Amino acid sequence: MKLKRHLLTAALTLFCLSAANAQLLRTTVEQGEIEGVEHEGFALYKGIPYAEAPVGNLRWKAPVSKKPWKGVFKADKWGDRPPQPIDPNQNGGEQGMSEDCLYLSVETPAKSKNDKLPVFVMIHGGAFLSGSYSGTQESFVKEGIIYCSIEYRLGALGFMAHPELSKESGKNISGNYGILDQVMALKWIHDNIAAFGGDPDKITIAGESAGGISVSILCASPLVKGLFRGAISESGRSFWPVGESRNGNTAMLTSKAAEAGGLLLQKRLKAKNLKQLRKVPAMDIVKNTAFESFWPNVDGYSITDDQYKLYEKGSYNDVNVIIGTNSDEGSMFSRPVSVSDYERRIHEIYGSWADQVLSLYPAKTEEETYFAQSDIFRDGSFAWGTYAWANLQSKTGKGKVYMYYFDQDSENTIVKSRKGGASHVAEMPFIYGYKFGSGKMTETEQHMEQIMSRYWINFTKTGNPNGDSLPFWTSYQEGKPTVMIMKEGLHLGPVQNQKQMDFFEKFFKEKRK
């Protein structure tokens, strides 16, 4: 009897060891040995530091590569999220919050370092103000894709420019630290993903909202040339003209305009110089900037120029892309006002173009001002940039553009569209399985979820969303019905709201003069 128990115990032990060995739970990266944890049958590496903590004298500096560690690094806890005014409530509330925030995660189904699996790198959104890496994505991993997600500095700590910082940099640049974090994280993934069974030549970067803008910026940045083969930008683009003000979300800031914002913050914090600024507690900076917009600026280094102009002359990372917007993007950012206030605001932003705007987006009642503002925000801040991206790359590049327009009215959303349609981030449950609102989906929506997630998975694997008897998605061609309209009965159609796109094309062209 004892012998039987002994043999059974030995067999169970051997089985457990074999199961553990089936996952790549320990590997070696540039900094040393690293050990992950088992999660849903896969190997999950939480909180991998890809750079030194940007604290003390490293605050407001380009990220510094992580030094080698001694022993085995236990990647079993999420790294802290960046200081921010909103709790993103990611990863089950397991994360702390501090300036020591430059971490990434890797979830891999690989059984061996030689598997050479495709890689999906997610850049979170949140207006460059809030958010946190999303940690795990079993729906992709179970399909043989390695899923990575990254943290980067946010708000003033990630994007404040300042004349002293520009002088200190040696390159006469400042701000854009959050973008430089993304660059370093992507380089780390590219250089180390083989240790997790990934193929560095099969990396797809993706993001939504500010994450999508980040993807757009990276697609034009020389700093990441050759580090990815595909890109997905959901509701994000960076094709505005370069200007001195972001009034009405109509411009990317010049470095000088961004530096002026840093000087104003210094004055508000009553700091005499940069040395004193670096000693201000991080959360005091967050509280004093609250929901102010510290965004990327055109510094001539990570963001080299007006992105529209870069794409006109073919100066960008020419890869296949999936890009798109939702039908009611602006509903999350709009509120009803009086008709007179609406018209006054339009004149303030658009000047001599105001009458054309009011003709395209009329409002006779307070309720109609909500819908008009929502549509202006959708088109000027989201849809036009996607339209410009598709047109320019299809003319000057070899990489194919797969453009979509998401228009499904669902209960599974953060903000319910008041006019029917899809609000900001409403596409994400259909791709990544997130649960928002009621979390409920109709049978038709569940079918859509299967199709949309499969498009994203196929694209990550091959660079083409098609296959598996899916509705065929033709690459974009200007003037032809090659936009995938994503709602009940997915189908190809023309660019939506073409008159509005034509207006913003002319408006932004004039602003570039």
Briefly describe each language-model feature range:
Residues 1-24:
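Bacterial Sec-dependent N-terminal signal peptides
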Residues 243, 272-446, 455, 462:
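Substrate-gating cap/lid region and adjacent catalytic-acid/histidine neighborhood
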Residues 90-271, 301, 310-334:
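Serine-hydrolase-like catalytic core of hydrolytic proteins
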Residues 22-176, 200, 434, 439-452, ...:
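Non-catalytic accessory segments of hydrolases
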Residues 108-116, 193-202, 269-275, 392-402, ...:
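Surface-exposed helix-capping loop/turn segments at secondary-structure junctions
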Residues 43, 99-102, 180-187, 213, ...:
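A structural signal for well-ordered alpha-helical segments within the folded catalytic domains
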Residues 153-155, 206-210, 404-410, 471-478:
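Short, solvent-exposed turn/loop segments enriched in Gly/Ser/Thr/Pro and often Arg
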